[in-house]
Design a protein with these regions (language model features):
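Hydrophobic transmembrane alpha-helices of multi-pass solute transporters/permeases
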Residues: 2, 47-51
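Eukaryote-biased feature marking scaffold/signaling PDZ-domain proteins and nuclear chromatin regulators
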Residues: 6, 41, 51, 75-78, ...
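Short, hydrophobic/aromatic-rich segments at coil-to-beta transitions
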Residues: 38-44
């Protein structure tokens, strides 16, 4: 009987400790996760023509890179924009940690990584509408592909200039294939 009690106690203790460790990262923002992983991070805001304000997260260098956030000389680094799919956010590309997450792997490979957030995520707002307004949520994939992604692409090009890679991981890319010609 005492053995069962001790096993249950140890199991409960394990779950309490594990839950405490998970809780810390579960409530961190994407920029906080990136910074905690040892990468430089920048937040940028971009406005769409229909008034949405989208937050983008930039990882301008890998952990072992000499270049850090805010340095003007990109030294030929290629910028790459990664955009999440339905019900996602930029967190999708950093949540698995530095050894397995796409954003970190690309940054360590020498890319200037930009993580885009489409309208409807926690990282989007609107100039006039509030989240509880029905009009805030009145959009479709059409607006993702025709408004959000081109605005993000323009922001990347404004900050970094060429060379750059068009979006490579995005469900809305099919909405407007012509955007890859920017």
């Amino acid at each position: 009987m005492n053995v069962i009690f001790i096993e249950v106690y140890l199991l409960a203790l394990f779950f309490v400790i594990t839950k405490a460790q998970l809780r810390k990262e579960a409530y961190m923002s994407v920029p906080s996760l990136i910074k905690a992983a040892g990468y430089p991070v920048e937040k940028h805001r971009v406005s769409t023509e229909d008034g949405y304000i989208l937050q983008m997260h930039r990882i301008p260098a890998g952990r072992r890179s000499a270049r850090r956030s805010g340095e003007p000389n990109r030294k030929g680094k290629r910028a790459i924009l990664i955009v999440h799919g339905l019900f996602g956010s930029s967190g999708d590309f950093v949540i698995m940690g530095p050894e397995r997450s796409l954003a970190y792997l690309l940054a360590d490979a020498g890319y200037d990584v930009w993580l885009g957030n489409l309208r409807g995520t926690v990282y989007s707002t609107h100039k006039k509408l509030k989240r509880n307004d029905a009009q805030f949520w009145d959009y479709s994939f059409h607006e993702h592909g025709n408004d959000d992604i081109p605005a993000m692409m323009d922001k990347v090009l404004e900050i970094t200039g060429p060379p750059w890679e068009p979006p490579v991981f995005s469900q809305p890319c099919r909405s407007s294939p012509s955007i890859t010609t920017k």
